Amino acid sequence: MTTTTRFAPAPETEAGSMSMFAALLAVAVMVMAGVVWDGSTRMRDANKAAYAATEAGRAASQAISAEAIAGRDADIDPSAGAVAARRYLAAAGVAGTVAVSGQRVIITTSVTWTPTFVPTGSQTMTGRAEARTVRT
């Protein structure tokens, strides 16, 4: 004699279903992940603009005039300083403006940020830096 064991079939109403809570939780987690991702890329691009402005200002302020080497005012050579700053910005892939005046250089940069998940549209992140030469 052979015995067979039979299991009761699952009720038809529960086949392949998931709770409403689990579905809403999954959607909420995906939305939060998208917001975190887009927030981090926005901060990255804002930092890129600020860092590029700072470093371009440093590059420009190193282009001092020949009179500064001779011991007079530590003025920045306007053409050499602007060229050095623009070269740095081009190498960094950042758009920007350069203004050199006497011992000061002002750099303004802009980076376009485009979100990946949140449909808010592109935004421009700007950075601004001012560098001065100081005789010590």
Language model segments and positions:
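Alpha-helical assembly-interface signal, strongest on the long, hydrophobic N-terminal helix that forms
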Residues: T2-I76
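Low-complexity, S/T/G/P-rich flexible repeat/linker segments used as non-globular hinges
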Residues: T3-T5, P115-T136
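Short secondary-structure transition/capping segments
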Residues: A10-S17, I106-P115
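Alpha-helix boundary/capping detector
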Residues: A22, A46, S79, R86, ...
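Hydrophobic transmembrane alpha-helix bundles
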Residues: A23-A33, A99-T112, R132-T136
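Residue-level signal for pocket-adjacent positions within structured domains
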Residues: D38, T112, T120
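Short amphipathic secondary-structure patches
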Residues: A59-V111
